[in-house]
Regions:
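Extended, intrinsically disordered, low-complexity segments
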Residues: 149-172
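Glycine-rich beta-to-alpha transition loops that act as phosphate-gripper elements at the mouths
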Residues: 109-120
Length: 172
């Protein structure tokens, strides 16, 4: 028993062929246990200044997406379309044309990492163009920290209850 229901393996910082090999290795292992694998093509940065993240940004190449999915056997694909991990220092500008082109090439669910701070209208548009899963880890951490700070003088279980409530509200 692997105590998990899915795996996300991000090898996107590696050169393309190494990314393919690493994801294929993970898929071969985890599929033996019926565990789906999410991969990333293109590289979603992690910078505190959005413009700096974009300077070395690697958008998902739609022409490689189909081959990548076929060669690796991944079950879902995280795309790099102008999104970054962490807190945005300015308004993110998503490349919806890239998303639309990738969606036409692959038959697996698409994932948007670094969605914390992306506006509701852009999220809705991304969903309409094929995004099936959205990661908002930074927003959830912020909600948890706000709840902890607001209830720091209360007993632990009361704080935990407020954190769960705040995270759930933020996620919805």
């Amino acid at each position: 028993n692997h105590c998990m229901n899915s795996v996300m393996r991000d090898a996107s910082a590696l050169p393309y062929e190494e990314n393919v090999a690493e994801i294929k290795r993970c898929v071969d292992y985890f599929h033996a246990y019926n565990i789906p694998v999410e991969a990333e093509l293109g590289h979603v940065g992690n910078e505190t200044v959005y413009e700096e993240a974009l300077s070395e940004y690697q958008y998902t190449d739609p022409s490689k997406a189909k081959e990548f999915v076929e060669r690796t056997g991944c079950d879902s694909l995280a795309v790099a379309i102008g999104n970054v991990h962490g807190v945005y220092s300015s308004e993110p500008k998503l490349a919806f044309d890239v998303l639309e082109a990738v969606a036409k090439e692959v038959d697996v669910p698409l994932v948007l990492h670094g969605a914390s701070g992306i506006g509701d209208e852009d999220i809705k548009k991304a969903i309409s163009l094929g995004i099936a899963k959205i990661n908002i880890h930074t927003e959830l951490c912020q909600a948890a920290m706000e709840a902890i700070n607001a209830h720091k003088d209360e007993p632990f279980l009361a704080v935990e209850r407020e954190v769960r409530k705040a995270v759930k509200e933020r996620a919805m």
